[in-house]
Regions:
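Alpha-helical scaffold/interaction cores of sigma-54-like transcription cofactors
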Residues: 1-357
Length: 357
């Protein structure tokens, strides 16, 4: 009551609606007529990239030609007609997909900051994950791994069925250079158009069940650990969780490994049974809820417009820097573009070791 000026902020019952006056009902109709559909969802808002060519895709193709000459030819891999056809067919296949999905700008941005820091003498990672399966990335020196040589598949990285979404090129830098990369992007595309992003920690599997057991004081600390340790780690069954309509680590354990948990809880005729059935039911209900927030370890958001006009901005928990106050999928849905810039300590150690030899 202190904060609200009315006690009617709820969905009324049928009987209550029948008591409304004709004027009230008419007013609702007038409000409805003044409302219009709109959406904040949009395609990726990539910043404009300066090019020497007439278009971004032509710039990309020219870089690929240069990569053929300067990267592929010195290896001797494209001397005979058979290999030339293999590499050309793969390049044309990838270019068709990239052009159709309008991703040339994305590749140009990544290639720009990767090669800029290589020119500065920074040890940049040779390639991480599915991006190493893209021959275009190799020709642009984004990655240093030839996917043809190692039999890596482009469609695992990106394919025409994913049109409208963005690829995911993770780039590794020494930790002491990561902030320099972000500063470079801010200076190039605008300080108000580049920032890091928020991520939420969630109660999943073991942590959800442990929280319920702790709050309810259902058992000793040792027994709590014994029970929760019988729940598999999320990463260990991630592929299986993707097959579930509503992914749940606890539900998966109850259905697929019931004997391990039978001492504490089991399911019978759709109902949970056992000494800890109530706690398991509560844990299932809270699984997936947010428990904490922090700054994403790798994600950097870049946009063609002022981020203050695109998404909520929040202060990071350990500092005064403003970061995007939404998670990756939500940011991409409203047009922000995420680049993964990781700090890998091993790269720093390798660089220092090479300098000492």
């Amino acid at each position: 009551i202190r904060y609200f000026k009315s006690n009617s902020y709820y969905i009324p019952s049928k009987e209550e609606v029948q008591t409304y006056s004709k004027e009230q009902i008419k007013a609702v109709g007038e409000i409805n007529e003044k409302c219009s559909d709109y959406t904040i969802l949009t395609s990726p808002r990539l910043p404009q990239v300066e090019t020497k060519s007439d278009s971004q895709i032509e710039e990309l193709k020219q870089i690929c030609r240069d990569g053929w000459k300067n990267i592929l030819m010195p290896t001797g891999k494209v001397k005979d007609a058979k290999n030339i056809k293999i590499y050309k067919d793969r390049i044309l296949q990838e270019l068709d997909v990239i052009e159709d999905a309008d991703l040339a700008g994305y590749f140009l941005i990544v290639a720009d900051y990767v090669n800029e820091f290589r020119r500065r003498g920074v040890l940049v990672g040779p390639g991480r994950g599915s991006a190493a399966g893209c021959l275009i990335s190799y020709l642009m020196a984004i990655t240093l791994i030839d996917p043809i040589e190692y039999g890596l598949i482009f469609s695992r990285f990106f394919n025409s069925a994913r049109k409208g979404s963005l690829p995911d090129i993770d780039i590794d830098f020494p930790p002491d250079q990561r902030e320099n990369v972000i500063t470079y992007l801010k200076e190039k595309y605008g300080h108000n158009r580049v920032c890091q992003m928020l991520t939420f920690g969630r109660l999943q599997g073991r942590s959800a069940l442990k929280e319920v057991l702790r709050v309810n004081e259902s058992c000793s600390f040792d027994q709590m650990n014994d029970i929760t340790n019988k729940i598999p780690q999320e990463a260990a069954i991630s592929d299986k969780l993707e097959e579930m309509d509503e992914p749940s680590v606890i539900r998966w354990a109850l259905e697929n490994d019931p004997d391990t948990l039978r001492e504490y809880c089991w399911e019978e005729d759709g109902e949970l049974q056992g000494d800890f059935a109530r706690e398991f039911a509560q844990a299932l209900r809270i699984e997936g809820t947010f428990k904490s927030q922090g700054k994403h370890a790798a994600g950097v958001v870049v946009s063609s417009i002022d981020l203050n006009n695109l998404c909520p901005m929040v202060k990071e928990t350990r500092g005064n820097e403003k970061i995007a106050g939404m998670e990756m999928n939500d940011l991409e849905a409203i047009g922000a573009v995420k680049f993964d810039i990781l700090g890998v300590n091993l790269l720093k150690k390798i660089h220092e070791t090479c300098g000492a030899v």
